[in-house]
Amino acid sequence: MQKIPLIVIAGLTATGKTDVAIELAQLIDGEIVSADSMCVYKYMDIGTAKPTKEQRQIVKHYVIDVVFPNEDYNVALFQKDATKAIDEIYQKGKIPLLVGGTGFYIKSIVDDIEFPEMGDSKQVRQNLYKELEEKGNMYLYEMLKNVDSKAAQSVHPNNVKRVIRYLEIYFLTGKKPTDFLEKVRKKGSKKYNILPLCFVMERSLLKERIDARVEKMFKIGLVDEVKMLLEMGYSKDLKSMQGLGYKQVIPYIEGNITLEEAKEELKLRTKQFAKRQSIWFKYQGDFIYLDVGNLEFKEVVKKCFELCKSVV
């Protein structure tokens, strides 16, 4: 069976993946599958740095706006949606590009990961967020320590989303999260001929990029977007509303912090997120790492285009 060519553009937030991918897709007659765990949510555009409608008119994108903010979405669902999209793109005679910064989403395709079955997590998650609101994050963290000390050691108590995710696994499967995740099988993709690119950047330059991106988000209407979501009835406790760009703005809307404090908090959290991404991607040895920090946009596109010739 002939393998499907697949161009992967992964990497750190604010390194220009989207713009390069759109330009590259036009050069190789491709379409883009988004690999971003926040871009799946409808109505959440600015805080997720989602490709604009204009960009999506230039090059078709998949796995964007697939669920409402109060609906569940996870890596297993992404794998199913992305695989379908890649097949559809290839059947049209075009080249699929998998683009984003959510590492586990990308690895689910690149490694063809096989996920054990889990039940519906919505009610469990709601109960855990209620516990969080009433008793605080340390209560949940201590709960995780009692359930699985190894999992607790791997996560900071303030990383509430990850703590809750681990507890979900326990309550849905009855197994320790670490035991459950060890059963996730990496088969290695036999279906795709993959060019795995990963954009990286020197830390000080990346921090400047992040600061500029956050300022732009506020300038083009991030606060109004978060207000709109709250007015639509989407709770601040939802998984989607706990994401970067939303969680940091809500205290400002509630009158608890100033606008400048909200900006600084988002900048800080985004930099921390980028650091976690950097560590994660650093240990994924199957990527070709491109330092895009000191390259002109056209140079990055050209370099990617030349590398594409090995699989296209």
Swiss-Prot record:
Pfam families named in the record: IPPT
Task: Show the catalytic activity.
Answer: adenosine(37) in tRNA + dimethylallyl diphosphate = N(6)-dimethylallyladenosine(37) in tRNA + diphosphate
Which co-factor is required?
Answer: Mg(2+)
List the InterPro entries: Dimethylallyltransferase, IPT, P-loop_NTPase
Entry EC number(s) = 2.5.1.75
**Residue sites binding ATP per the record:** 11-18
Listed HAMAP family? IPP_trans
Question: What protein name applies here?
Answer: tRNA dimethylallyltransferase
Q: Which organism is it from?
A: Caldicellulosiruptor saccharolyticus (strain ATCC 43494 / DSM 8903 / Tp8T 6331)
